[in-house]
Swiss-Prot record:
GO molecular function annotation: aspartate 1-decarboxylase activity; pyridoxal phosphate binding; tyrosine decarboxylase activity
Regions crossing the membrane: none
Source species taxonomy: Archaea, Methanobacteriati, Methanobacteriota, Methanomada group, Methanococci
Residues that bear N6-(pyridoxal phosphate)lysine: 233
Similarity comment: family membership: Belongs to the group II decarboxylase family. MfnA subfamily.
InterPro entries, per the entry: GrpII_AminoAcid_Decarb, MfnA, PyrdxlP-dep_de-COase, PyrdxlP-dep_Trfase, PyrdxlP-dep_Trfase_major, PyrdxlP-dep_Trfase_small, Pyridoxal-P_BS
Name the UniProt record assigns to this protein: Probable L-tyrosine/L-aspartate decarboxylase
HAMAP family, sorted: MfnA_decarbox (MF_01610)
Pfam families hit by this protein: Pyridoxal_deC
Catalytic activity: L-tyrosine + H(+) = tyramine + CO2; L-aspartate + H(+) = beta-alanine + CO2
NCBIfam families assigned to the protein according to its UniProt record, in alphabetical order: tyr_de_CO2_Arch
Lyase listed as a keyword: yes
Cofactor dependence: pyridoxal 5'-phosphate
């Protein structure tokens, strides 16, 4: 085929994809990347962080990005990597937990909430972890009293806890402050999955925070061992750009495997070949937007979230919980049926597992007119 014919054929396939800016994607935690990412992607498209000695500049950028992420998570000594996404980040954290537990001759018993991302189910299967599921509170967060009692019971040997800061379905945040105290007092590891919340909570204005709700989640809490944070969600980086950060580089030895034929003789990430595009794009976008830019981005998303909730209630819909961040769960006893009917009209929402509700993620690509159009379609769908 000629080059132009190839491109024309590819455009036909691409035209079948949904576009973020059209406003029909309401259930994804990803969004249209910042425009500067196009230029950066072209500059770094051939780089491979799997062999960092060949790409010294890109490798240095990764260290800078980890430092920048560490800074917004209150840790100037953070160690980690920019990887494929939240799934790989969570798998990496669980792999470290497993290897640390083995080194201490402890059982691999880990407390993980029902609201956790499905990547932890993959980790359980791959690593043969024994998972304890604590009950949830009315706010869909883990019952801290149950966890404390369970951990302190001498019969239950727990090696780690997973807390969620912005759960995939509802946006709820576990009480990481109390979980951190339990982790410190009992010498156990605590991983925080802030794949979504990591680029929301640090920039969230107090006026959007729920009263009586604890938003603390990062390395400012002494018990936090590791954090998942994804730049390709609210960070506006292109896919794939996920992040895993550990408190310090003492965790590296629990991840390293020998890689004698590479320029560096050990490798810690699950995926070997890693494009530098995610690293470079994250660096550029974070430098361009800065703290103020992300604050504006989050505040705009929260204003749209408030609008969605207000309009939904005018139509007679109720939320499963008051939104903790820019994720809304609208109660629906026939969620799967409603979801499929909406899809027939080209609206793509998702459903919650832990509650009978539709799930809408108010990402930056959504505009007020998209939200209003969706709610009108939802209302019409429920009439029939």
């Amino acid at each position: 085929m000629e080059e132009q014919d190839i491109l024309n054929e590819l455009r036909k396939y691409r035209s079948q994809d949904l576009k973020y800016e059209e406003g029909y994607i309401l259930g994804s935690m990803c969004t249209k990347p910042h425009p500067i990412a196009r230029k950066i992607s072209e500059m770094f498209f051939e780089t491979n962080l799997g062999d960092p000695g060949l790409f010294n500049g890109t490798s240095k950028l990764e260290k800078e990005v980890v430092s920048m992420l560490g800074s917004i998570l209150h840790n100037n000594n953070a160690f980690g990597y920019i990887i494929s996404g939240g799934t790989e980040a969570n798998l990496t954290a669980m792999r470290a937990f497993k290897n640390i537990s083995k080194s201490k001759d402890k059982k691999q018993n880990i407390i993980i909430p029902e609201t956790a991302h499905f990547s932890f189910d993959k980790a359980r299967d791959m690593m043969d972890l024994n998972v304890v599921r604590p009950p949830l509170t009315e706010y869909f967060t883990m019952d801290v009293k149950f966890i404390r009692d369970y951990v302190e019971d001498s019969k239950n040997e727990i090696s780690g806890i997973v807390g969620i800061a912005g759960c995939t379905e509802l946006g709820s945040i576990d009480n990481i402050y109390e979980l951190s105290k339990i982790a410190v007092e009992n010498d156990i590891l605590l991983h925080v999955d802030a794949a979504f919340g990591g680029f929301v909570i640090p920039f969230l204005d107090d006026k959007y925070k729920l009263k009586g709700y604890n938003y603390d989640f990062d390395f400012s809490l002494n018990g936090v061992s590791s954090i998942t944070i994804d730049p390709h969600k609210m960070g506006l980086a292109p896919i794939s750009a996920g992040g895993i950060l550990f408190r310090d580089n003492t965790f590296k030895k629990y991840l390293d495997v020998d890689a004698p034929y590479l320029t560096e003789k050990q490798q810690a990430t699950l995926i070997g070949t890693r494009s530098g595009v995610g690293v470079a794009s994250t660096w550029g976008i974070m430098k361009l937007l800065g703290i103020e830019g992300y604050e504006n981005l989050v505040n705009e998303s929260m204003e749209k979230t408030k609008h969605l909730v207000k309009k939904a209630r005018e139509y007679g819909f109720e939320t499963a919980i008051d939104p903790v961040m820019n994720i809304v769960a609208l109660k629906d006893e026939n969620k799967q049926d409603t979801c499929m009917k909406l899809r027939e009209e080209n609206w793509y929402v998702s459903v919650c597992r832990c509650v009978e509700a539709l799930r809408i993620v108010v990402m930056p690509h959504l505009e007020i007119e998209h939200i209003d159009g969706f709610l009108e379609s939802l209302s019409n769908t429920k009439k029939y």
